[in-house]
Amino acid sequence: EGSSVTALSVGAKSVVDNGKLSKDVLSRGPNDLTLVTDDSFVGMLPSQTSDVLAKAAAKIGFDLIFCGQGSDDLYAQQTGLLMGEKLGVPCINGVKSIAAGDGIVTVERELDDEIETLEITLPAVLCVSSDINKPKLPSMKAILGAGKKPVTQWSAADIGYENGTQDVVAESVLAQQQAERLNVIIEGDSDDDINAFAEHL
């Protein structure tokens, strides 16, 4: 009660400044949307993206920031953690559930062989996994109402961001070629069958 949710996105103007995309974001619940656009925001690395997000978030003001675990392009899983570091606030990744308290949040994250429960004070940054919820499709009322919600646009200069020289430049992003399934079926439980099975693992 009394809380407000601001969606924040950064990127090249040609990509982020999209009325249809803004409306889609706002139809899913946020009270308003802030876009930070600049022609130099192309091919940014996590260190740069987190810097822009941190400066914009600091200007907006916040108690709790939610980030995805990773982006669709690089999935480096670094941006949210770097953002928390630059803002000087606690940051937890891999979060699968959240319970809010008075000035604190209790979160759970799944590790290899256990579920870890952590309590952190606000303000904070949380990087959530896909297990956090199952997004619902927005209703027609929400879609129509999204067009009336405010959208703020800032430039890099508005948040005091200067695009410095990159120490590392990503020239390409490659994915391993998907291997074809061999459909090898081994029946039996003899030593030879087990050895043959092991060879195909």
Located regions from the model:
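N-terminal glycine-rich FAD/FM-binding segment characteristic of electron-transfer flavoproteins
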Residues: 1-201
